[in-house]
Amino acid sequence: MPINSSSDTLNDLQARVAAFRDERNWERFHDPKSLAAALGAEVGELLEQVMWLSTEDARSLTPEQAAAIRDEVADISIFALHLANSVGFDLGEAIDDKLKVVAERIPPSQDAPARKADA
């Protein structure tokens, strides 16, 4: 499977990470608990990239900072796809379903509440 296609759908990516896993015989390590733990660790690595930045600095990242964040978000996304495969659901469908729930709760006409950092 090609590894560099920006036109892949989320379903394509979900299939590609499954194939990547299978090619390495990693399925035995990919239970929901282990994948959730790995996902949490990757989120922690993302947080390390921005934890000590001011809100202003976080909005104007250096190219190096942006690249590090990009790598961590990719890791998070890969583990989320692996977790979806392990549990047995279509992540794209789950995202669509969640957006519908949030849209019902928060109509587009509502302004976002101000945050302390923005006030």
Q: What do these predicted regions represent?
A:
Residues M1-A119:
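Flexible "arm" and connector segments at domain edges
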